[in-house]
Amino acid sequence: MDIETFLAGERAAGGYRCGFVAIVGRPNVGKSTLMNHLIGQKISITSKKAQTTRNRVTGIYTDDTAQFVFVDTPGFQTDHRNALNDRLNQNVTEALGGVDVVVFVVEAMRFTDADRVVLKQLPKHTPVILVVNKIDKDKAKDRYALEAFVAQVRAEFEFAAAEAVSAKHGLRIANLLELLKPYLPESVPMYPEDMVTDKSARFLAMEIVREKLFRYLGEELPYAMNVEVEQFEEEDGLNRIYIAVLVDKESQKAILIGKGGERLKKISTEARLDMEKLFDTKVFLKVWVKVKSGWADDIRFLRELGL
């Protein structure tokens, strides 16, 4: 579709809907996995570790009747206070401004004080849909127990509606889309129908490397790291990408590189393969490690990183 046709609104509003949907919840309830399934493509990083999403990621799903613009947010942080986590929480609050509907994600059979903290941040005049995720878990397979859990959570807040899903297995994702659709305003689409994210290739490359860091490092180390794309060159049939991983200490650098450079090599290789699949082209990827002490508490530096 050329830009003139798109801007002219080739598809008249006439019943068509388009709007913004914020996906929020405490860390590690499956928000990023949910968004990836909602749009039908992986653009937001996932990990079993909490707080893998640091930047708001916009995913777009378009069908014949509606266009959904999803905003995936960092999990709201209640522990480990520092400038970085304060900024992540501010990102959550900012993401809620101007959306048409909010999806509040909780883990099936597990509602905690951290969930309640997030609930208190939700807007009072925007519809909020409760989404109970991970219904594939053994404890959630008891229908009556699951219904009782949903009723328990609904008693905590005035939700507009509720749905139970398994983001991991793609269960009831279509039901959730249909549930959300009436909350979007009538409008022509904001983005071309073949567009799945408004994020740049540089940003997506950075996110892929961050995902591999979370996958192959210990529980704490990835949280002390940041990823920067220092150079991104698109040539005919080849993307050349140069990425620096920022750590706080020399000891962290040694752990990341691994014995004989094996760990960094594994991270780089898997990231390159994912990039080639996403960008549909060959990728030359160079990843190295830099040490900057105290970066996570340096507010000016965090702003430079766009956090």
From Swiss-Prot:
It comes from the Bacteria. It is a peripheral membrane protein. CDD domains: Era, KH-II_Era. InterPro entries: G_ERA_dom (IPR030388), GTP-bd (IPR006073), GTPase_Era-like (IPR005662), KH_dom-like_a/b (IPR015946), KH_dom_type_2 (IPR004044), KH_sf_prok-type (IPR009019), P-loop_NTPase (IPR027417), Small_GTP-bd (IPR005225). GO terms for biological process: ribosomal small subunit assembly. One of its GO terms (cellular component) is plasma membrane. Residues 25-32 are annotated as: G1. Residues 217-293 form the KH type-2 domain. Residues 165-167 are annotated as: G5. Residues 17-186 form the Era-type G domain. GO terms for molecular function: GTP binding; GTPase activity; ribosomal small subunit binding; small ribosomal subunit rRNA binding. It is found in: Cytoplasm; Cell inner membrane. Belongs to the TRAFAC class TrmE-Era-EngA-EngB-Septin-like GTPase superfamily. Era GTPase family. An essential GTPase that binds both GDP and GTP, with rapid nucleotide exchange. Plays a role in 16S rRNA processing and 30S ribosomal subunit biogenesis and possibly also in cell cycle regulation and energy metabolism. Monomer. This is GTPase Era.
